[in-house]
Amino acid sequence: MDVRQHTDRHYDAELKELNLKILEMGGLVEKQIEHAISGLVDRNDEMCRATIERDHVVNRMDVEIDDICLRLLALHQPAAKDLRLITTGLKITTDLERIGDIAVNVCERAIELNQEPQLKPFIDIPRMADVAQTMLRQSLDAFVNENVELALTVCRNDDVIDQLTDQLFRELISYMVEAPQTITRAIRLLFIAKYLERIADHATNIAEMIVFTVKGKSIRHLDQVPGSV
C-alpha cells in the first residue's frame, strides 16, 4: 500500500467518524428534548434535574466534533463537496449544542411550573415537541444520506410549528385576560412554546446547510422553500 492510498483510507475513516459523532450527538439531544417534555407533562422534577445535569455531555461532544472538523481541515485541506461537508459539520454541532441548551431551559421552566397547580391539560406542547423532534431527526437523516428532498421537507414543516405556537399563544392570552392569577404560569408555558419553536428553527438551519452541502446552493432567506434544487 503506498502512502497516498493509506492517507486516503485514513481520511475516509475520519469522515465516517465525523458522521457517526454528529449522529450520536443528535440522538442525545433528541433524548434531552424528550426527557424535558416528559418532566413537564409528568411533573417530574427529578427527570428535569437529570436532564439539566446531562447537558455537559452534549457540550463535551460539541468540542470533540469541532476538534475532528478542524483536524480534517488542517491535515487534508479538503476541496469542493468535502470542504462543504466538514464546514457543515461544524455548523450542525453549533445548532445541536444550542438545542441542548434549550432543553435545559424547558426543564428550568418545567420545575417552576411543577411547584404550582397545572394550568391546562398538556396537549399542544407535547404535539409541538413531537413536530420539533421529528424535524431534528429528519434533518440528521438527510445529513447522513445526503437526502435533499428530506431536507426540503424539514424546511417546509417549520411553518407547522409556527402555526401551533400562534394557536397556543392566543389560548394563553385568553387565560391571562380572564384570570390574572394565571399570568405567571401562562407566561412560563409561552416560554416553553417559544423554546420549541427555536428548536424547529435550528432543525431548519441544519436542513438548509445540507442542501448547500449536497447541491452547493444556498436556500437561506428565501421567501418560500423551493420544490426542488
Task: Give residue ranges: language-model regions.
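Cytosolic, long alpha-helical scaffolding segments
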Residues: M1-V229
